From Swiss-Prot:
It holds the Pfam family RhoGEF. GO terms for biological process: Rho protein signal transduction. Residues 313-488 form the DH domain. Residues 1-48, 109-140 are annotated as: Disordered. The keyword Lipid metabolism does not apply. The gene is PLEKHG7. This is Pleckstrin homology domain-containing family G member 7. SUPFAM superfamilies: DBL homology domain (DH-domain), PH domain-like.
Length: 691
């Protein structure tokens, strides 16, 4: 085969190691198979960072020109490396660095004739299949390539999905055409083809990348670093906050001055009589009784206007208004305000009734008329006044805990700030307003007692005293209900977080076949924490010393047994857990466990208090193990044999002493209660004489 040498004009190097650009020669027709994609072609381009670094190190030296026998009529100076004249758009600058000249020399000069013969042998297999290729891969004729080259000279690069062949008229083209092409054969321009790190591409010029946007390394084609990108969340959140503030600015709060008794809450009884030209009574005791009733009335006015009405009109109604405009929809009004609506109506009726009897007394022309307040007190204190306060107070602790969980939200914080800035709040915050019904209920007996002391009529005193006793009994019942409710809620949450492992998991000594495990599952101990007769006396976090490690444990001391558990926090937090639903009486450690979706796994069977022995450990005995503030708990069976032992370590000496004192007191109380039960069982009624 004839070998030709190509002539290339001298071009000053533009990059490190750049060599003169060769001209295009006509390609023989029998070499069409060489236009197929070849990953091993010398002109391949790699975007691999490692290969780019190798090229960067080798581009500092210039190699002398050397002659290479090319395929067909292709020719290039010796040592000519194939590269792109322009960098890929969006790619690093070093992506067009030179290949190693030694590698090119060894690959191009090894056996050129064998490569040519192999190409000729592949021609009959590749030619007939051109008609079955898709339109993107079918070859084009020379005329279309010539027209494309002319358009390229004019500066218009049109994308083409077809394969690019060297034009046989390449010698007659403008020299800029030579600078745009390389002796590497072809670029596969496939629809949807993207360039990724490590891909090998064969290109005939940098212009191909400019005219084919499918091969651009655009940022849109790459996947983001995080699949669920939070891009734009800040803008949406800012817009939501701005819309919430605009909605709050449209809220209108009505004035409280429309009530008839609004101007009387800050006046004294003498000022009221003087305003209405009413002469005070000559009886000193009757006047003191009237002043006591007036104190009940004015305090109820202040309670209604400055607390209940503020909570209802400013806080609760504003929240309802926001929820109608689709803000704070997940905030539960009942959990936050309970029966505030009922409480407000009851207090308003009580104030209006007292205001009515006072107005009748002041407007009366008779001097000897008296205040008829007994009927009003009987109606409300024996009616719905105490009952409505009880309902509210039972929900108070949960409401405060729910409020603290809502304070962490930005939108709810903006709502609270807007409400508390209202002038009718009188610089009172939400917790101070929510606690007002509890304080009011405990003050009622004091106000009634003051009226009872000032009364002279015996029948009247008996009625007032009975009303006072009724209110005090209601408060005692409320305290019992609060304790019972708190204990019930606490045990309910303990049942959820305390895990009772089966026998075969708790102790590996016992072997239970799968066919028999259903027998033991029927007698699991989930219901052992029944709140009816069992109370939690003390709880806390300690450290259990084992043979090879220290284990964080959590102890529950009940009135009849001790439970040792180990806390296990879930690394994947449960998204559905609502912190507002937790019992407020739980310790911070248990609340943290619940928030993280963790649990408390029982280490051993419950230790009855009559089988429990607690002993203090001197530091001298355990100093070699690095233990401090340690004490020992022994579990004995009915034969006084030790069947389990727990070496526990407290954080401080005071915590250790507190634990030992609590356990000792619980053991003593449990032993006395057991002895009392035995005595009652052995005490039999007297025998009848008729038997």
């Amino acid at each position: 085969m004839e070998k030709t040498e190509s002539f290339c004009p001298e071009v000053p190097p533009q990059d490190c190691g750049a060599s003169p650009r060769p001209s295009l020669r006509s390609l023989p027709k029998n070499q069409g198979s060489l236009l197929q994609f070849d990953r091993q072609a010398p002109g391949r381009i790699s975007t691999s960072p490692t290969l780019r670094r190798l090229r960067t190190r080798g581009c500092g030296t210039r190699q002398d020109a050397w002659q290479v026998t090319t395929w067909g009529s292709w020719g290039a100076p010796v040592g000519f490396p194939c590269y792109l004249s322009k960098s890929l758009p969006g790619s690093p600058k070093d992506s067009s660095h030179l290949l190693s000249p030694l590698r090119l020399h060894s690959r191009l000069t090894s056996e050129p004739e064998r490569a040519l013969n192999a190409a000729d042998s592949l021609e009959p297999q590749t030619r007939p299949t051109d008609k079955y290729l898709p339109p993107e891969l079918q070859p084009v004729n020379e005329g279309s390539l010539h027209q494309a080259s002319l358009r390229q000279q004019e500066g218009h690069f049109l994308p083409s999905p077809t394969l690019r062949h060297p034009s046989p008229q390449g010698e007659e083209l403008h020299p800029s055409r030579f600078y745009e092409h390389r002796r590497s054969s072809v670029v596969l321009n496939l629809p949807g083809l993207e360039v990724f790190p490590g891909d090998l591409l064969v290109s005939d010029g940098a212009a191909d990348y400019l005219c084919h946007p499918l091969l651009l390394l655009n940022s849109e084609s790459k996947k983001p670093r995080w699949p669920f990108s939070k891009r734009g969340v800040g803008k949406d959140k800012h817009k939501h906050i701005s819309d919430l503030e605009n909605c709050l600015s449209s809220v209108k709060i009505t004035s409280f001055r429309g009530y008839d008794f609004y101007g009387l809450k800050d006046k004294t009884w003498d000022e009221v009589l003087e305003t209405h030209h009413k002469l005070p009574t000559d009886q000193l005791d009757l006047k003191k009784q009237q002043e006591a009733v007036w104190e009940l009335f004015t305090s109820e006015c202040t309670y209604f206007l400055d607390h209940l009405l503020v909570l209802k009109m400013i806080f609760m109604n504003t929240l309802r208004y926001l929820q109608t405009h689709e803000y704070l929809l997940d905030v539960d009004l009942w959990r936050l305000f309970a029966n505030l609506e009922e409480l407000t109506q009851t207090s308003l009726g009580f104030v209006n009734s007292l205001f009515g009897i006072i107005k009748d007394y002041v407007d009366a022309s008779e001097i000897s008329s008296s205040l008829d307040f007994i009927s009003v007190l009987t109606k409300y204190f024996r009616g719905s006044l105490c009952q409505s306060h009880q309902t509210y107070c039972l929900n108070y602790s949960a409401a405060i805990f729910y409020l603290e969980s809502l304070r962490q939200r930005d939108d709810f914080g903006i709502y609270l700030k807007w409400c508390e800035q209202n002038e009718q709040c009188r610089r009172l915050h939400v917790p101070e307003l929510l606690v007002a019904p509890l304080q009011r209920l405990t003050r009622y007996p004091l106000l009634l007692k003051n009226i009872w002391k000032r009364s002279m009529d015996s029948a009247e005193k008996i009625m007032i005293y009975s009303i006072k006793e009724k209110v005090e009994k209601s408060i005692r019942d409320l305290e019992g209900k609060v304790k019972w409710l708190d204990n019930f809620q606490k045990f309910r949450y303990l049942q959820e977080i305390i895990v009772w492992p089966p026998l075969w998991d708790r102790d590996k000594r016992f072997f239970i076949p799968e066919c028999l495990k259903h027998i033991f599952k029927e007698h699991m101990a989930e219901n052992i924490l029944s709140p009816t007769s069992r109370h939690l006396l003390y709880e806390g976090k300690l450290t259990l010393a084992e043979s090879t490690r220290f284990l964080d444990v959590y102890l529950f001391l009940f009135n009849d047994f001790l439970l040792v558990t180990k806390t296990k926090c879930n690394k994947k937090k449960l998204g559905g857990s609502d912190p507002g639903l937790m019992c407020p009486s739980l310790t911070p450690e248990l609340q943290a466990v619940i928030k993280e979706g963790g649990s408390c796994t029982v280490l051993d069977q419950p230790i009855p208090l009559d089988r429990l022995v607690v002993k203090s450990i001197e530091p001298l005995h355990v100093s070699v193990f690095g233990l401090r503030n340690a004490f020992l708990i022994q579990h004995e069976n009915r034969y006084r044999q030790c069947i389990a032992a727990f070496l526990l370590q407290a954080q401080t000496e005071n915590i250790k002493k507190t634990w030992m004192a609590q356990i000792t007191t619980a053991i003593s109380c449990f032993t006395k209660s057991q002895e009392t039960k035995k005595i009652s069982l052995f005490t039999l009624p007297a025998e009848s004489s008729e038997i």
